[in-house]
Amino acid sequence: MVEVRNPSFCVPDFIALLRKFETPVVFAEHGTYPAIADVTGDFVYARLQKGNDEIKTCYPPKQLDAWAKRLQLWAGGGEPDDLPRVDPAKAKKGPRDVFAYVIHEGKVRAPAGAMELIQRVT
């Protein structure tokens, strides 16, 4: 798994290289780091980093619902159409493991956000 923090990696050649070696790229939902939703390996790792400690569940219910749908879509072998991809080519179809890590600056409400996501995807 590779986590990039510079937009210079947002090029199709980088995605092709990761796919060649079946290496997942981290999807970072972050204000600074690039968000790359391309599926490049046999699992997806998402870092949800825009939570808000003012919200009891870290994210508003509509956003939690949207994330649950995305995570389920990835798990079922699909790809969310509402997240940015670098390469328009679709990944191989098929079920895959999905790991979602809820974390942000304050971290106080991140566990509540993770528990809410678990309830929505199970």
For the regions a protein language model found, what residue spans apply to each?
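Residues lining hydrophobic/aromatic ligand-binding pockets adjacent to catalytic sites
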Residues: 1-122
